[in-house]
Amino acid sequence: MTTYTRKVSAMRAAVHDTFGGPEVLRIEDRPIPTPSPREVLVRVVAASVNSADSRIRGRRFPRGFGGVAPLMFGVRLPRIPVLGGSFSGVVEAVGADVTGVAPGNVVAGTTGMAMGAHAEFVAVRADRVVSVPEGVSHDDAAGVIFGGLTALWFLRDRAEVQLGRSVLVVGASGAVGTMAVQLARLAGASVTGVCSAANADLVRSLGAERVIDHRAVDVTTLPDRFDVVLDAVGVLDRHTGRRLLTPDGVLLLAVASLADTVLARGNVKAGSGPERASDLAHLLDLVAKGEVRVVLDDVLPLDRIAEAHARVDSGRKVGSLIVRP
């Protein structure tokens, strides 16, 4: 483990200055960011490590995005040295133009493309954070964000899931999948989950009426037809997914190739949704009321960031994975 002497006015952060495996990550001192007039400075208590962090670090993107993504994340060297897009913590300071948020407030939020949450402090726009309800832990608040926002946008906004609909969730034990199963169930849908046999009981406990072992059954050959199919892991494309739909069904591709993203039309929905503070507040309220459960694979100190990335890379992560600075 790397050791170093702490600098005044510095923070610990997980940094990568080259692309590669989890081993490229290290902990180093970085300047504590100064919030702009419309930003807040948050002392991070918990941050999630998810597939977005893994893809950027390893420069591994869905098919077709290899020529586009480097323009955002760096061609030869990383453009974003500190990853992490979802966090929970305590407001340390606010910019001159910020109202409604004060030092000491417990908040959760997103960073957008700027990332930076895998550190002791992060500066973000004030409209990107919301209050964490009493009784919701920092780990749960950070853990609900990535999967919850994705699942909510696809199921509620893109497919309009409602009572009596049949929903298939592929990748039902991951961060997106565990939230999708629960949100679909809350909407009154009948849920079928696809995951490994080891996670079948978990997925059932979240509300799936039926669970399919992806190692035993090729999901693309299922004889069943569903009103909504949400692929959270990139198993399906617009052709194989459509075969699983009822005549008026909707296919949701959370991990889509460039071609599927560009050519998504009609009953095929792909792409990434907005990170709306109102949606995050809604999800946190559901957690506070006990209506959804945040599944946590592990909670690790920031010093073990490489281990966290390796777990994400393995494809065996269950729910969300949290690091604490």
Question: Residue spans of the language-model regions?
Answer:
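Glycine-rich phosphate-binding loop and adjacent beta-alpha segment
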Residues: 232-292, 324-325
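C-terminal hydrophobic helical "lid"/dimerization subdomain
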Residues: 4-9, 280-325
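A short acidic, Gly/Pro-enriched loop at the edge of an enzyme's catalytic core
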Residues: 221-228
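Short glycine-centered segments of the SAM/dcSAM-binding site in methyltransferase folds
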Residues: 106, 166, 190, 249-250, ...
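A structural motif shared across PLP-dependent enzymes of the aminotransferase-like
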Residues: 113-126
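Mid-domain Rossmann-like dinucleotide-binding core that forms the NAD(H)/NADP(H) cofactor-binding site
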Residues: 102-103, 142-213
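Glycine-rich beta-strand-centered segment in the early N-terminal region that forms part
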Residues: 31-48, 62-113
